[in-house]
Amino acid sequence: MSGIPNLKDLVFRDTPFANLMNKRIYNVLLIATKYDSFMLEDDGRVDEQIFNEYTSLSLRYPPRFTQVTTEEEALNELKNRNFELIICMPNMDNRDIFAAASEIKVHYPNIPIVVLTPFSKEVSKRIANEDLSAIDYVFSWLGNSELLLAIIKLIEDKMNAPDDTASVGVQIILLVEDSIRFYSSALPHLYKFVLEQSQMFAKEALNDHQRTLRMRGRPKIKLARNYEEAVRIFDQYRDNMLGIISDMSFMHNGVKDPYAGYKFGQYVRKTGLIIPFVLESSEASNHVYAKELNASFIDKNSKSYPQDLKKKIMQRFGFGDFVILNPHTKEEIMRIKDLKDLQKKVFQIPDDSLVYHLSRNHFSRFFYSRAMFPPAEVLKHVDVSDYKDMDEARKLIFDLIVQYRRMKNTGVVAVYQKDRFDEYSNFARIGDGSLGGKGRGLAFIGAMVKRYPKLESDNFAVNIPKTVVICTDIFDEFMETNELYPVALGDADDETILRYFLRASLPSRL
């Protein structure tokens, strides 16, 4: 029996991006000596560094930092204000920070506690002998302010992942690594890449508001520090797993297992799920295990590790351009940049290439990585063997894109862009001013049709004409630039007014 859906029965619902990422970190309590606070700030305020990081990535709601130096001050702040995260910086002369964390955890068990410490062999030995049961994460401060952003986003992802994956299918990237120093370095690179990609994909949104909301649908990152934690996270999110990055050697059953990453890869492969897997190791000889798992391999000792990681994620996890390959030679046939480009080129993809990419879920991953969940969900559940031929596959992909674009365009006032306005566009504006009465009325009807789909039926379609509205600020610019207000509001006759208006130049935006 074919698993291909009947598109007439399939109704796409707009993704409620506004309901995603509802739990955020607004206030951070930093417990550190004055010297450690100064070292962290590096002659600049923590708030300013975080604000700059958020701004550079078009993120909103940067948290505020409150700094204290003692446990008593921390408990007093916690009594009087709400904090979503506590960061502790232990000093070698102050051995009570872990005891303080345990005491705080007793009174505030739901607030995550992170230990942030400079890296040294002495610190590593000390942490190995400490009771870390009250600590959620330990990070090594390497002088990079991007680590603070990564810590905040990691905690936010942990808080929001259960609801966001269940409600709309937000994807998960799992990093398995037990080296504090290494994941403290890798996570900032990983987050910066994912956030930059999401920022780029969000440009396909129809207006600034939708662009901001769509970034909430970016893939979330989860960190596992031992085999059991990796299996637990994988089992919980296996249906939403965009990809996995795993070290080769980490803790398994309480002891260091040099083949834990390989064993975890085997566990993943036994599920039969098609999930990209990147195996990392400090020993180049372990690439043979990656090959056996049909995984990519990265040498952790490589000086180009950040670039290698970015390249593998770009290739395997659905980010960047969709490169259509010849399955026999692995040569590039064509490159697809965005949704509209895929719609235009899908009928040009050769049969064998289409089978190759469909059988590996590359199309659904292309949609998932861009937070286009409705078409991704459909394609994910259609097996390549369900298609009677590849023409049927091409038609399904094309029709899904058309239906998705129509759904996204309905009831939305888009910003007019010449290269994007086509037969599937509904309503766009030029300018930032008021739509005016007629334009606002049409926009209202479009919004009602989207909000109440039962208004439409097979026998009675409700829609609005394709519309481009020139906003009032464009009209004002036209009038002021050409000095037409005195003419229009004066005593001149109609023929004179008409002559002045016909001579006038339109604003360059038109």
What do the PLM-derived regions correspond to, one by one?
Residues 30, 113-115, 175, 279:
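Structural beta-sheet core signal
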Residues 37-40, 121-125, 183-184, 285-289:
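Short, charged/polar "capping" segments at the starts of alpha-helices
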Residues 1-66, 102, 130-137, 141-220, ...:
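Non-catalytic signal-transmission and effector/linker regions of two-component phosphorelay proteins
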Residues 341-344, 349-510:
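N-terminal beta-alpha lobe that positions the nucleotide/phosphoryl donor
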Residues 9-10, 39-51, 62, 67-113, ...:
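Conserved phosphotransfer microenvironments
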Residues 97, 127-138, 289-298:
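As written
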Residues 116-118, 280, 300:
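Hydrophobic/aromatic residues positioned on beta-strands within the core alpha/beta folds
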